[in-house]
Amino acid sequence: MGKEKETRNYSRRYKSEYNIFRSIFFMIFLWVVVNPVTFFMYKLKVKGKNNLPKKGNYILAPNHVSEMDPPFVASAVNKHIAFMAKKELFDKSDKRHDLIHLLGAFSVDREKPEIATFKTVKDIFQTNWPLGIFPEGGTKKNKKIEDIRKGFVVIAKHAKADIIPISIVGFDGYAKKLFEKDITVVIGEPISYKLDADEIIQKWCAEICKNTGFENCMLNKEEKVEV
């Protein structure tokens, strides 16, 4: 019962939580803690930043190769992001969930989003925070795009929010010293939420594989998505 209650609490967040104070905290944390790591240890480069919408709701959807992906994405877009984190992370008794919750993240079942998830998304999109979702559901180290979680499409359609595919390119391990790694974040053109669910998934996979060189195991694979 305790774990179930904790997950429910972390999955439901309100518009009032994404206020100016949390926005300022996020950006200070980004500039003071995150950016020095991403730019000086991973020599982060950003391509396609002009593809970010100037206004309106949108979902940032990166591939997932490491636990550094949220920092890479936040540094690349230079904006506060409400990341969806897998519910298992909030079930663990470690300190990470306290920090990411403070930074605006919330718990989600990506395979079967709950009503609380849609209410949270609706509240977030009444602010100027974009949503961050990893369609793969967890980190993948086999250089293949496969087993995409369909929840991000369901959420995009319910929220009427376009999807911005983001490719994280070049990760081959964690940096231990300055200027050791080279990471490129490629921000792709928006994918309309109005497209068929299967087409959205195929477009996302194709964009990620084009930039990363990963094998597209979702090619021509149909996904049945209930919206």
What are these regions (language model features)?
Residues 49-53:
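Glycine-rich helix-loop-beta junction characteristic of Rossmann-like nucleotide cofactor-binding loops
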Residues 2-48, 72, 92-103:
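A transmembrane-helix-recognition feature enriched in membrane-embedded lipid enzymes
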Residues 48, 85-86, 104, 134-135, ...:
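A secondary-structure boundary/capping signal
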